[in-house]
Amino acid sequence: MEEAEYESVLCVKPDVHVYRIPPRATNRGYRAAEWQLDQPSWSGRLRITAKGQVAYIKLEDRTSGELFAQAPVDQFPGTAVESVTDSSRYFVIRIEDGNGRRAFIGIGFGDRGDAFDFNVALQDHFKWVKQQCEFAKQAQNPDQGPKLDLSFKEGQTIKLNIASMKKKDGAAGTPRARPTSTGGLSLLPPPPGAKTAALAPLSGEHLSVGGSVVQPAVSPSSGGATVSWPQPKPATTATADIWGDFTKSTGSTSSQTQPGAGWVQF
């Protein structure tokens, strides 16, 4: 079911005059000077409404709001509303009754601003109608709309102006100063497994091995340039029985041999 159309009010003017106009003998436009402007046929209120795409010019009584005449407008500018050639305050409209009969009458406004608002209200409505028709066509045929072409034409060039950029402090690529140490000289420990070179004593110094002073041996062939230090002897391995201390401390108990003499008694 189609959505019901509602009637909206576009313009209301409280003072409008209606005139009888003589029939137009030629194709030239209407002239307000040919009307009896000092003797209007009717005076009242004008109201412009819209229902769907059709606008309606309604002439109503100022007090009761009773409808005097109505002019449906389906196109503007068009034959339903025409401007006169000698004034901007007067128009010719085509009124219709419920039986399909039509007649042309003249209307006029006392204020030029009211005539301007009347004209603009009709223009805005039909501008909206035109946009709605275009949107409906685009919705039905979306591929037929104009496509935006952003490609370069043959021989077309562009020019880019790039301003010089200043390097900021601490930017990438700028070496930073290493912070100075406030303490003494700090050395990293040697890596695990590294061999440390033995330090040779200076002249006049003696090497102490096992509590005794050892003099370095000088090689006669080298002219005293090479010093050969004796290597410390490995500790002698005790040849005594490892259980000797335990057997000595037992004293007389060792004379009493228990069964299984191969075991040491604690």
UniProtKB/Swiss-Prot annotation:
Organism per entry: Bos taurus
SUPFAM superfamilies per UniProt: PH domain-like
UniProt function note: Involved in endocytosis.
Pfam family, one: DUF1681
Domain of life: Eukaryota
Family stated for the protein in its record: Belongs to the NECAP family.
Name of the protein described by the UniProt record: Adaptin ear-binding coat-associated protein 2
Disulfides per UniProt: none
Chain location of the short sequence motif WXXF motif 2 per the record: 263-266
Assembly notes: Interacts with AP1G1 and AP2A1 components of the adapter protein complexes AP-1 and AP-2. Interacts with the GAE domain proteins GGA1, GGA2 and GGA3.
Phosphoserine modifications at: 181
Gene3D superfamilies the UniProt entry points to: Pleckstrin-homology domain (PH domain)/Phosphotyrosine-binding domain (PTB)
GO terms of biological process kind: endocytosis; protein transport; vesicle-mediated transport
Motif WXXF motif 1: chain residues: 243-246
Sequence segments annotated as region (Disordered): 164-191, 244-266
Transport recorded as keyword: yes
Biased composition regions of type Low complexity, renumbered to the chain: 247-258
Sorted UniProt keywords: Cell membrane, Cytoplasmic vesicle, Endocytosis, Membrane, Phosphoprotein, Protein transport, Repeat, Transport
A GO CC annotation given for this chain: clathrin vesicle coat
